[in-house]
Structures are given as C-alpha cells and as structure tokens.
Amino acid sequence: PKEEHKTRDIWTAEVLQKALEACDDDILRLAINLAFSCSLRMGELLGLTWDCIDISPTSIELGQASIFVEKELQRVNREAMADLDGKDIMFKFPPTFASTHTALVLKTPKTKTSVRKVFLPKTVAEMLVQRKADIEELKDLFGDEFVDFNLVFCSSNGKPIEGQVINRA
C-alpha cells in the first residue's frame, strides 16, 4: 500500500519573521534564510559546498551572487548503497562509529530538475561571506583537528551537520 505523507504547514511571512527574530544562532539563521530565499530542501541545504557558491565581491555588487544546487546530504543504508554500486554517490563521509548500518553521503538529487542555479539576495550573500570567515577562524583554532569537507553547514570541527540537529534547534 502507498504510504500517506503528512502535509506540512507552510510558514507565512509573519511566522518566518518571528522565527528569525527569535533565532539567536547565526548558523540556524543562515539556514533559515537560505531555505526560504532559495527554496532549498534540508538535504540540499546541508550538502551545500563552497565550490558551488559564488559570493565574490563583484558578484554581490552586481546582484549576481548565486549557489549551484547539485548535491544533497543524506544518510543511506550501507546495503542499499552497495546495491547501487556507488551510483549517484558523489562522496561518502568517514563513519563516526564503526558499527553503523548507515553511511552519510553527498549524492546527486533524485531528479534532474533539482539541479539548478539560484541567485542570492544580497543580505543572504553577505551572511555567507561571514560564514566563510567564521569557518576560516575555526580552521585556525582547531588546526589539524578540523576536517575540511568544504561544507557550508558543518560542526565546529568541520564534520557534517545532519538534519535532525537543525530540526531540534
């Protein structure tokens, strides 16, 4: 039988504004702004890498700052991944625990139309510039302990952030 999906409530502009006003975490604020201004799904947001972002001063000045959405972060069953023979998997993150039955990966989106270029509002582009600077500071602070996967949304040691972390915040 077909699985019934719950319909999700769509935030109004007022609810979004209240959420942003109540948000005191810069990373979460950036995630909310990117999700709404660029219509990003959670996996696309968390799979965003710096090589897919154009936030050069010239691009921002000309209103051409953009992101290229070509991958998503997803936790997949190791057996299913073996069956796929690596198809659609762009990168497999090292496991945190040896005994897990799943793996965290960057994979291509489900549909070709999900691959897209999205232009950024200037305010969001400037937030990304600040995030990049913050990550550079973390790299200096943590040195060799910082694992650089080139992710926009990463923990303080560079490792990926999963969706449930954002959902809990």
Residue ranges and their predicted role:
Residues 1-50, 61-64, 113-115, 144-148:
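Basic, Lys/Arg- and aromatic-enriched nucleic-acid-binding interface segment
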Residues 8, 12, 20, 70, ...:
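Residue-level detector of conserved, well-ordered beta-strand and adjacent loop positions
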Residues 15, 48-137, 141-149:
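Conserved tyrosine-mediated DNA breakage-rejoining catalytic core shared by Y-recombinases
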Residues 17-28, 38, 118, 133-144, ...:
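Short, basic (Lys/Arg/His-rich) helix/loop patches that form interaction surfaces
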Residues 36-38, 73, 124, 157:
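Short, flexible loop/turn elements at secondary-structure junctions
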Residues 41, 76-77, 161:
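Flexible loop/turn segments at secondary-structure boundaries
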Residues 44, 127, 169:
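Phosphate- and divalent-cation-binding pockets in alpha/beta enzyme and binding domains
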